[in-house]
Amino acid sequence: MRHYEIVFMVHPDQSEQVPGMIERYTGAITTSGGTIHRLEDWGRRQLAYPIDKLHKAHYVLMNVEAEQAVIDELETNFRFNDAVIRNMIMRTKHAVTEVSPMAKAKEERFTRRDDERREEATEAASEE
């Protein structure tokens, strides 16, 4: 089996369908004997340039190990699913399991925001 990195972008109006799509695609990979090494839902993000007059899209990243037939099936599903506006399937040399820079940045942003709120709360409590 080969390793692949898969990124697909979903129309922002169809964001509520993303969990079902992820479940369907991961199910197809695992039932055929493949494994999912990394799955990240990056959420709705700004596009670098408009695609079909859209400025935002819902991003999903997957690193998988699967047979070529399953990847062909996924590619066909992406092509005929109107909610998927772009996709990229890239073969990699090895399994990637560490957290992506996108997810790290999002995590750091949330922890920094939580730390600032805690500091403000302790300052407000000490002033009283």
From Swiss-Prot:
CDD domains: bS6. Keywords: Ribonucleoprotein, Ribosomal protein, RNA-binding, rRNA-binding. Gene3D superfamilies: 3.30.70.60. GO terms for molecular function: small ribosomal subunit rRNA binding; structural constituent of ribosome. It comes from the Bacteria. GO terms for biological process: translation. One of its GO terms (cellular component) is cytosolic small ribosomal subunit. It holds the Pfam family Ribosomal_S6. Residues 104-121 have a biased composition (Basic and acidic residues). The keyword rRNA-binding applies. Transmembrane segments: none annotated. Residues 100-128 are annotated as: Disordered. Binds together with bS18 to 16S ribosomal RNA. NCBIfam families: S6. Belongs to the bacterial ribosomal protein bS6 family. This is Small ribosomal subunit protein bS6. It comes from Aeromonas hydrophila subsp. hydrophila (strain ATCC 7966 / DSM 30187 / BCRC 13018 / CCUG 14551 / JCM 1027 / KCTC 2358 / NCIMB 9240 / NCTC 8049).
